[in-house]
């Protein structure tokens, strides 16, 4: 399991079960245990677990026109379900299609919570204490990350033909 030194107490989260993970693979409890391990409080949407609601991407609804002549997008309906839960800090997902669909829908319906991968909540819980006690600036996504040290790169290039 994960090691959290400063729990995300008071953080309000909802989780969207992705279609294939929940309906076909019946994996619904593991993501909830991860949320629980962070110390965040989980608020369930009415349709969750194996009864989850599709984001719309898999059925071609991702290509609906912007005019909404066909009605509200499934992803917007789902974000409204999350909004109906009251104040939320985060809506977490574990599917790349869900991330794209719900991020866009959250902007469209002006949701006041962040849509992101579940792993971002775990990262926050694991690094929060470090960020609170560190004087260093926190990492932001626009900063380059070095995955291989320069010495390792130069050693490798010296031995690579």
Where are these regions (language model features)?
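Iron-sulfur cluster-binding electron-transfer modules in prokaryotic oxidoreductases
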Residues: 1-161
């Amino acid at each position: 399991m994960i090691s959290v030194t400063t729990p995300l107490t008071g953080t309000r989260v909802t989780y969207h079960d992705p279609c294939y993970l929940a309906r076909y693979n019946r994996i619904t409890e593991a993501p909830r245990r991860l949320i629980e391990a962070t110390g965040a409080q989980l608020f369930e949407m009415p349709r969750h677990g194996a009864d989850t609601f599709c984001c719309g991407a898999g059925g071609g609804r991702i290509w609906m026109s912007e005019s909404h002549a066909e009605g509200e997008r499934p992803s917007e309906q789902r974000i409204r379900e999350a909004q109906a839960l009251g104040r939320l800090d985060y809506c977490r997902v574990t599917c790349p299609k869900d991330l794209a669909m719900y991020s866009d829908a959250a902007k469209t319906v002006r949701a006041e919570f962040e849509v992101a991968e579940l792993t971002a909540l775990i990262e926050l819980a694991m690094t929060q204490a470090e960020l609170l006690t560190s004087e260093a600036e926190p990492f932001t996504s626009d900063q380059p990350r070095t995955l291989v040290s320069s010495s390792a790169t130069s050693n490798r290039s010296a031995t690579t033909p």
